[in-house]
């Protein structure tokens, strides 16, 4: 998932690429588009229900998906999940949109993903 809080992000023209992505995501300043965007915005569609185990990853220096979006998304998901499954947040403190650069750093991120998946499957 890329933008977790579509409405807030696309309302902030100071965020890089926002205005260039109106054609793809919609422009919340347009009333009809706002209500359409609300139907697919992950953050705005969290409700009380069972959710699977979730690992959300982000990078502090991601210019395309601001780090505070997943930091806001995860606690709301935890609050509304009725399943008891874990919801984790991993913040990369040095990487950008593509994560850490370098072969070993990238492998560490992949290892985190596989570790999470294998741990959940073994429960």
Mark where each language-model region is.
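Active-site-proximal cap/loop segments of hydrolase catalytic domains
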Residues: 4-123
